[in-house]
C-alpha cells in the first residue's frame, strides 16, 4: 500500500510536466504556422490598395512574376478552378530566420469579385480534390469571403496552387449580376525583407548608418556581426548590428560612405501580382445563342435543299 502511494506521488509531477510541454508545443506551432498570412491580415483591412498595389509588396521588395489561369466564362452556382502559378528556380536556397539556408516557401492572395467564394468541400469533385492536395485556404476576413489567402507552403510541392471557387447565383444573390469581372492575384516565393513594424529581416542587405572608418568587427556567438564605425563628422562610435544570414562585404580599417552596403543581399525570392477577367454567364443567353445558331444552321440547310430542288426543276424543264 505504501509503495502504491509513493508511485502516485512521483507520477503526478511527471504528468504535469508533460501537459505543460504539450501546451507550449501547440502554442508555438500555431503561432509559427499562422505568422505569414497574419502579417497582412492584421495590418490591412483590404489587401489591395486604391492604387491597385497589393500590400504584400510592402514586405517582399523584389519583383517576381506570377500567373493566374481562370475560365473565360462560368455559369451561376458552378465550381471552377483558379490556378495560380508561382515560378522560381528549385535549386535556389533562401536564408532562414536562424541564418541557415533552406528551401523557399510560397504563398498567394486571391481577390475575387463580390459574391465569388471558396467552394464548400461537398461541392468539390474528387478529381479537383486530388489536384488541391493538402492545401488549406482561409478567408482574409470573416466578412470578406471573396478574398482568399494561402501559405506559407513548401515551394517544391506547391509552385502551382489550385483554388476551388464557387460562382454566385444572381437569382439567389441580388448583388450578383451577369457581367465581366476582374480577378486579382498576388504571389510570393521566399521570405520578406521587412516586417510589418518596419524592422528589417535577415533576408535583406544592411547598409552603413554613418560615414567613416570601420574600427572593429565583432563576430557574435550566435551568428551575425557587430560593426563599429568611427563617424567622420564628429568621431563618435556608431555600432551597426548585422543578424546572421547576410555575408559581410567590408573589413576593419575600411573607409565607408553613408548607406554603403555592409553586406550582400541574400534575398532570392520576391513578390508579383497579376489579374484576369471572368464572365458570369446568363444560362438564358447561352440557350438563346444556341437556339439562334441552330436556326441559322437549319435555314442554311433548307436554303441548300431549296436551291437543289430549283436546279432539278430547271433541268427537267430544259430536257422537256
UniProtKB/Swiss-Prot annotation:
Its cofactor is heme. Belongs to the cytochrome f family. PANTHER family: CYTOCHROME F (PTHR33288:SF10), PTHR33288. GO terms for molecular function: electron transfer activity; heme binding; iron ion binding. Component of the cytochrome b6-f complex, which mediates electron transfer between photosystem II (PSII) and photosystem I (PSI), cyclic electron flow around PSI, and state transitions. This is Cytochrome f. Residues 1-35 form the signal peptide. The keyword Iron applies. It comes from Piper cenocladum (Ant piper). GO terms for biological process: photosynthesis. It is found in: Plastid, Chloroplast thylakoid membrane. Keywords: Chloroplast, Electron transport, Heme, Iron, Membrane, Metal-binding, Photosynthesis, Plastid, Signal, Thylakoid, Transmembrane, Transmembrane helix, Transport. One of its GO terms (cellular component) is chloroplast thylakoid membrane.
Amino acid at each position: 500500500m505504501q509503495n502504491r502511494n509513493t508511485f502516485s506521488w512521483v507520477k503526478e509531477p511527471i504528468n504535469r510536466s508533460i501537459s505543460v510541454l504539450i501546451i507550449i508545443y501547440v502554442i508555438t506551432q500555431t503561432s509559427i504556422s499562422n505568422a505569414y498570412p497574419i502579417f497582412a491580415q492584421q495590418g490591412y483591412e483590404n489587401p489591395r490598395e486604391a492604387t491597385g498595389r497589393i500590400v504584400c509588396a510592402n514586405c517582399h521588395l523584389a519583383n517576381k512574376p506570377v500567373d493566374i489561369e481562370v475560365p473565360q466564362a462560368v455559369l451561376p452556382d458552378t465550381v471552377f478552378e483558379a490556378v495560380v502559378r508561382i515560378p522560381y528556380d528549385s535549386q535556389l536556397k533562401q536564408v532562414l530566420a536562424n541564418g541557415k539556408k533552406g528551401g523557399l516557401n510560397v504563398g498567394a492572395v486571391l481577390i475575387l469579385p463580390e459574391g465569388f467564394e471558396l467552394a464548400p468541400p461537398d461541392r468539390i469533385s474528387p478529381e479537383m480534390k486530388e489536384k488541391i492536395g493538402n492545401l488549406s485556404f482561409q478567408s482574409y476576413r470573416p466578412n470578406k469571403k471573396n478574398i482568399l489567402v494561402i501559405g506559407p507552403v513548401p515551394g517544391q510541392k506547391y509552385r502551382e496552387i489550385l483554388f476551388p471557387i464557387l460562382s454566385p447565383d444572381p437569382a439567389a444573390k441580388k448583388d450578383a449580376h451577369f457581367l465581366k469581372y476582374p480577378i486579382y492575384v498576388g504571389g510570393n516565393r521566399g521570405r520578406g525583407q521587412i516586417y510589418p513594424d518596419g524592422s528589417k529581416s535577415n533576408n535583406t542587405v544592411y547598409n552603413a548608418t554613418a560615414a567613416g572608418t570601420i574600427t572593429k568587427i565583432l563576430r557574435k556567438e550566435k551568428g551575425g556581426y557587430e560593426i563599429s564605425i568611427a563617424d567622420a563628422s564628429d568621431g563618435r562610435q556608431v555600432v551597426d548590428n548585422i543578424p546572421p544570414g547576410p555575408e559581410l562585404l567590408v573589413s576593419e580599417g575600411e573607409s565607408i560612405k553613408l548607406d554603403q552596403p555592409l553586406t550582400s543581399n541574400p534575398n532570392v525570392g520576391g513578390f508579383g501580382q497579376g489579374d484576369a477577367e471572368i464572365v458570369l454567364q446568363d444560362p438564358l443567353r447561352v440557350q438563346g445563342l444556341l437556339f439562334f445558331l441552330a436556326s441559322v444552321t437549319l435555314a442554311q440547310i433548307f436554303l441548300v435543299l431549296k436551291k437543289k430542288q430549283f436546279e432539278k426543276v430547271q433541268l427537267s424543264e430544259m430536257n422537256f
